[in-house]
From Swiss-Prot:
Stored InterPro entries: SAM-dependent_MTases_sf, UbiE/COQ5_MeTrFase, UbiE/COQ5_MeTrFase_CS
Binding locations of S-adenosyl-L-methionine: 83, 104, 130-131
Alphabetical list of CDD domains matching this protein: AdoMet_MTases
Name the UniProt record assigns to this protein: Ubiquinone/menaquinone biosynthesis C-methyltransferase UbiE
The organism of origin for this protein: Bordetella pertussis (strain Tohama I / ATCC BAA-589 / NCTC 13251)
Listed pathway(s): Quinol/quinone metabolism; menaquinone biosynthesis; menaquinol from 1,4-dihydroxy-2-naphthoate: step 2/2; Cofactor biosynthesis; ubiquinone biosynthesis
EC identifiers of the protein: 2.1.1.163, 2.1.1.201
GO BP: any one term: methylation
Gene3D superfamilies: Vaccinia Virus protein VP39 (3.40.50.150)
Amino acid sequence: MQTPHSQPESAPQGEQSTHFGFQSVPEADKARKVAEVFHSVASRYDVMNDLMSAGLHRVWKAFTIGRAAVRPGMKVLDIAGGTGDLARAFAKRAGPSGEVWLTDINESMLRVGRDRLTDSGLLVPTAVCDAERLPFPSQYFDRVSVAFGLRNMTHKDRALAEMTRVLKPGGKLLVLEFSRVAKPLAPAYDWYSFNVLPWMGKKVANDEASYRYLAESIRMHPDQETLAGMLRDAGLDRVQYFNLTAGVAALHEGVRLG
């Protein structure tokens, strides 16, 4: 039986392994397993985020949009963009003279986001791509964002290095992610995550396993200070983070200076 503080189960010997929730799996399998989760939840992704955050993800995204300070004419890349919430806001701010891309490794997720942007009257270019191998020129974007996506990436360091590569000097990376909650709230948060959330996933989406993985993936994600160090290692300066709702989520940001 797994607990919120369990160690990952072992992958087969002789293979490079990584974590998939609390499981240790061969690296080659993680992307496939994550894809299966998000194919399953794509049509109810906003419901999933509402369940995981008690609706607060909308407030956190609004804070991220404000910190991005996108201006007319800017070029913006939204990675793992899901249903397009950030891309929609960025496109409105960048205006017709700007350029905003919505990307996701998962075609099902990208289709939902693309359709919603079209329904909003916004023509935003989209691309299915891996954040570890971005198909964009170096020093191209003024802003790069990733919301609730980094924790699902196999090699977070490679992904952060790629995000830094495509930033212009003076450009900013923003990483919004579930994080390490303040200790006094941890017992209640763990109980909610590992009991209530899977139960609601089963009732709302008939998919208990995917929601259990999502809870586990949050616990395996680096804490705030560790992630800040990873941004610095990727080549970013002026790195800082903002705890949101007592650390249930955190917004990290860094600037490429050279």
